[in-house]
UniProtKB/Swiss-Prot annotation:
Name of the protein described by the UniProt record: NAD(P)H-quinone oxidoreductase subunit 1
Protein task: NDH-1 shuttles electrons from an unknown electron donor, via FMN and iron-sulfur (Fe-S) centers, to quinones in the respiratory and/or the photosynthetic chain. The immediate electron acceptor for the enzyme in this species is believed to be plastoquinone. Couples the redox reaction to proton translocation, and thus conserves the redox energy in a proton gradient.
Cellular component GO terms, alphabetical: plasma membrane-derived thylakoid membrane
GO biological process: aerobic respiration; photosynthesis, light reaction
Entry's localization field: Cellular thylakoid membrane
Keyword annotations of the record: Membrane, NAD, NADP, Plastoquinone, Quinone, Thylakoid, Translocase, Transmembrane, Transmembrane helix
One Pfam family matching this protein: NADHdh
Gene this protein is translated from: ndhA
Family: Belongs to the complex I subunit 1 family.
Length: 372
């Protein structure tokens, strides 16, 4: 189902109607995608931080933030401003270049990964044919930044935290990639748009979660580990490592780690929504909505309605998963480092391999149901 809304085409037509040439309109469009990504990511982080604070307060029978704006909604902005004006301290014996570069290498790949996230048929920044592969490639850069930050701090706690972060990320990237590969195999495409379209034929019955329940669980567990969320927050375990690789960081550099962690959480939830929960798709087929309203499926009214509802559905599914991740953080104990690595290498990796082989077999036997 095509929403008929293409951001770039609509923007260029608008500027050309105002008298600007096509060349100028294309040049003005170039910086907009990244601005849209940054805006969406920052808004997503602000909402997620506020949710985390209120849910954690409820779990601990507290009130939580309530003075900064209505219901404390402006508290994340107050925290950000506080970190922004704090002094930027670099330890005397730290490696200045690596110490500064580490947080940047952690944040930039996460932000760039938002380029492939679709909120509708044409409502995404970059519709590249290898979107999933691009995301996996970008996510593999983050452990380098974490290890670099821990090493450059010249602190034993920071180094241990960086080593843990790198080991954890590498251990869980492989089963995560294998779980995604099963989805790619069924969709016959690496494009996030194609993966969502393949799930929108029969409403919620065609969502990949029903055909890949094991893959869904593997992906979700690995995503939480990649985000370093409890019960997998070993790299920054306060009782053992003070703050892990973040120990020597303050001010804006610390804020970059904080920002990257929450952007990664929202991104992971978006990817689960896209890969397993139909993305912008509705629980019922779009054709039923068009028939109920007595409109053609290609009419402008239906196009606008489906595009708007598609954004709402994507955000709703995403924050449902964010809510689940926050609940898990405040209700589960931290695992040990040996348990963490055993889970990744001895359980999730073999299970993800078996799941991939089983998916390939089902695709051969039941091609109509598994994308043959």
């Amino acid at each position: 189902m095509n929403t008929g809304l293409d951001l770039e085409v609509s923007f260029n037509h608008l500027l050309q109607d105002m008298g600007l040439s096509s060349t100028i309109s294309h040049l003005l469009w170039l910086p907009l995608p990244m601005l849209l990504v940054l805006t969406a990511a920052l808004i997503g982080v602000l909402v997620t931080v506020w949710l985390e604070r209120k849910i954690s307060a409820a779990a601990q029978q507290r009130i939580g933030p309530e003075y900064a704006g209505a219901l404390g909604i402006l508290q994340p902005m107050a925290d950000g401003l506080k970190l922004l004006v704090k002094e930027d301290i670099i330890p005397d014996k730290a490696d200045n270049l690596l110490f500064t570069l580490g947080p940047v290498l952690v944040l930039i790949p996460v932000i760039l990964s938002w380029l492939i996230i679709p909120f509708g048929q044409n409502l995404l920044i970059s519709n590249v044919g290898i979107g999933i592969f691009l995301w996996i490639a970008l996510s593999s850069i983050q452990p380098i930044g974490l290890l670099m930050s821990g090493y450059a701090s010249n602190n034993k706690y920071s180094l241990l935290g960086g080593l843990r972060a790198a080991a954890q990320s590498i251990s869980y990237e492989i089963p995560l990639a294998l779980a995604v590969l099963a989805i790619v195999m069924m969709s016959n495409s690496l494009s996030t748009i194609d993966i969502v379209n393949q799930q929108n034929t029969l409403g919620f019955l065609s969502w990949n979660i029903w055909r890949q329940p094991v893959g869904f669980l593997i992906f979700w567990i690995c995503a939480l580990a990649e985000c370093e969320r409890l019960p997998f927050d070993l790299p920054e375990a306060e009782e053992e490592l003070v703050a892990g690789y973040q120990t020597e960081y303050a001010g804006m550099k610390f804020a970059l780690f904080y920002l990257g962690s929450y952007i990664n959480l929202v991104l992971s939830s978006l990817l689960v929504s896209v890969l397993y929960l139909g993305g912008w798709g509705f629980p019922i087929p779009v054709e039923l909505i068009a028939n109920t309203l007595h409109q053609s499926i290609n009419s402008p009214v239906i196009q606008i309605i489906t595009a708007s509802l598609g954004i709402v559905m994507t955000v709703f599914k995403t924050y449902l998963l964010v809510f689940l991740a926050i609940l898990l953080r405040w209700t589960t104990p931290r695992v040990r480092i040996d348990q963490l690595l055993d889970l990744g290498w001895k359980f999730l990796l073999p299970i993800s391999l078996v799941n991939l082989l089983f998916t390939a077999a089902l695709k051969l036997v039941f091609p109509f149901a598994f994308g043959g």
